[in-house]
Curated annotation (Swiss-Prot):
Location (main, coarse): membrane
Spans within the Cytoplasmic topological domain: 682-687
Entry-linked PANTHER family: CABRIOLET.-RELATED, EGF-LIKE DOMAIN-CONTAINING PROTEIN
PTM comment, free text: O-glycosylated. The major glycan is a trisaccharide with Glc at the reducing terminus.
Protein name stated in the entry: Variant-specific surface protein VSP4A1
Pfam (any one): VSP
Compartments in which it is found: Cell membrane
Signal peptide boundaries: 1-14
Family: Belongs to the Giardia variant surface protein family.
Extracellular topological intervals: 15-660
Gene Ontology terms: cellular component: plasma membrane
Annotated keywords: Cell membrane, Glycoprotein, Lipoprotein, Membrane, Palmitate, Repeat, Signal, Transmembrane, Transmembrane helix
Chain segments annotated as transmembrane: 661-681
Amino acid sequence: MLLTAFYVVLGSFAAPCQQDGDHIVTCQVNKCETVGLFEICTECKTGGVPVDGFCRPFGSIQAAAAGCTKADGTALDKTATTCGKCGDGYFLFMGGCYKTESQPGSEICTTASNGLCTACKVDSQYIFQNKATPSEKGSECILCWDTTDRNGVMGVANCATCTAPASSTGPATCTECMAGTYKKSDTECAACHSDCATCSGEANNQCTSCETGKYLKSNQCVEKNTCNTNHYPDDTSMTCVACTVLDANCATCSFDSATAKGKCLTCNSNKIPRTTLDGTSTCVENSYAGCQGADNELFMKEDQSACLLCGDTKEASNDKGVANCRTCTKNANDSPPTCTACLDGYFLERGSCTTTCADNCATCSEATTEDKCKICKAGFFLASPGEGKCISCSDTNNGGIDGCAECTKEPAGPLKCTKCKPNRKPAGTSDNYTCTEKTCEDPTVCGGTSGACDAIVIDANGKEHYYCSYCGETNKFPIDGLCTDNKGTNAGCTDHTCSYCAAGFFLYMGGCYKIDTVPGSYMCSKSTTAGVCDTPNANNRFFVVPKAISAEQSVLACGNPLGTIAGGNAYVGVEGCSQCTAPDARADGGMAVATCTACEDGKKPGKSGTGCVACPDANCKSCTMDDVCEECADGFSLDNGKCVSSGTNKSGLSTGAIAGISVAAIVVVGGLVGFLCWWFICRGKAQ
C-alpha cells in the first residue's frame, strides 16, 4: 500500500478493524492496531495467528516460516489466536511474529535476535524502546498510546508521538497527541471541546479544526451562516476566510463553488473587484486599464461600477461581452468590447466566437474543418505538424498509444504519453508513460477515486481481472463487475453496492454476477433461487463458502487469504493457490482455510494444503517451507529436508556399488590370505 517520511497514527490501542481494510474478516473484534501507515491484527479468530500483521492459518506455511509457536515452544493447535514465540529472523510484537526486513515489521524494529526485538525503530516517533527487562516477551517495543503496564512501563492514552521514559520505568514522554485531544502535560493528552476536531486547549475558542459541518473562525467552530459580512465560508478548507485574504482592499466576498476559490464582491478605497477566468479575485483601480489588466480577460462597464469577463453576455448594449471570448479590448465608452481570442474549441471570425472548431480542436484556422486544427484539446494530438486533424491519444490505428489519456508531440519528435487512462497502470517516466495492463475492467474505475475496484476474478487461463466492488455514484451498483444504474431483477442493489442477488445471480464482493455470463461464469456454474452459489466453476479456482446465505458472499477465490464471513465464521483461501477444495464448515466463530491442491508460479502446496512454497526438487511431493521438503516421492527418503534415493547412503554410493566393492574386497582379501598360506606353509616345507 508508498510511504512518506512522516507517519500519521490513524488508530488507537485495541481499535476496531477498518471496514474496508484487510483484517475485518479474520481478526477478532477490536483487535486491530495501526502502526504508521499499516493496519495490523493483534489477535486472530480461532485457528489463525498474526504473521507480519496478517492472520494466517495456524498450520500455514507463513506461520511455520515465522517459527510461530505457543509461549512454551510447543506447536500451535486449532485453538490458537496469537503467537507466543517466534523463530530466527522474526520478532514477537503484540501477539504476532514480524520480519525486520519488510513492512510492517521494519517500521517497528530494526534489529532482532532469538525471536525478540533488540532495537526498536524509535525514529518513527510512534514507538519507544522498553528500557526495563520485560518479563512478558514481545514487550521490548511499546506504542506511544499503549497504556498496558509492562513492568511499570507504558505509553500515554491518545498519544501519537513520544520518547521513552526518562527512567527505566514510568509513562512515556508524549510529544504530540492524537486528533481530538491536546497535550496537557508530558504524560497526559486531554480531550478537546466537543466542537473541535483538533485543538490547542480545552476551551471552545482553542480549536484548530472543526468537526464535519462546522467552520473554523477565530479558533472557534461556527455554523456556515455566521461566515458573513467580511468573511466567506471556504468549503474546501472548512474555514471562515477573511475577505482581506483575497485582497487587502476587499470589503465583502463569497465562495465560488465553480472555481473553489473566494470571490471579492466589493472593495474599499474606490477600487473595484476583478475576478479572472481561473477564479483569482483582486481589487483594482477603477479604470479601463485596471479592469483590462495584463491578461486582457476583463473589461470595464461604462458606468465604471464593475469589471466584466470578455465572455459575459448578461449585460446590455456596450457592456455586453462576446460569447465564448477569452480576451478582449475596450478602451472607451460608446463601443462594445472587441474580442481578440476565443476560448478553446471556438474559432474567431469577424469578431465573433459563435462558430466552433472541429471536434477535439482547441484552436483552428477554419471553423468546423477537421484538418485545420492548430492546437488540440487535452487527450488529442495533431496528426501532422503545423495544422491538421486531432487524433485521440489512445487511437492505436492512427499512431496513438494504447491506454493513453493525455499526450504530447513535438513537430519532429515521437508521440509521448503524459497521463494514462484511469483504468490503466502507468510505467516509465512521467513525460513518456507506457500504459500497462488494466487496473480495472470498468473504464470509469467504478466512479474514480470514490469508487473501488477490488473484486478479483480469475479467468480460465489463471489471469487476474479487477472488477467493481463499490460504485462512486450513489445511483449505481456493480452488476457483472461494472457500475450501472440498471439493477434488473436484483432488488438488493441500491446505492453503491448490492446486499443480495436474484435467482440466476450470486453475490461476490459487493456486486451481483450472472452464473452464465463472463466474469460470473469463471466463478460459479450453478446458484440457488435465493442467489447463492452452490456449485463452483469446474476449474476449481474458486470454492463455495460453506453455509453462506443470500446476504453473504457464497464464493471465494482459492488464492484469497483475506477471506469472507459466513455464519459468523471466517473462510479464507491460500495465498498463491490456483486450485483448491472448500474447507469444512465451522460453527465457533473461528477461521477455516481451503485446502490448496495446485499453486501459481511453479510452487507446490504444502502437505496440509495451507500454503504454497518453492519446492524445486522433482523427488519431493511437498515442502514445509521454501526448499525444505516434508514428504518425498516413492523410492526416496528425507535427509535434513532433502530427498535422497532410498538406495543411497550418506556417502552417495548406491547399494549396488557398495555390494560390488564388498565382493571385490572379499576377493582381494581371499587372495591375500591364500598367498600368505602358501608363503608360510609351502615355503616352509621347501626349506
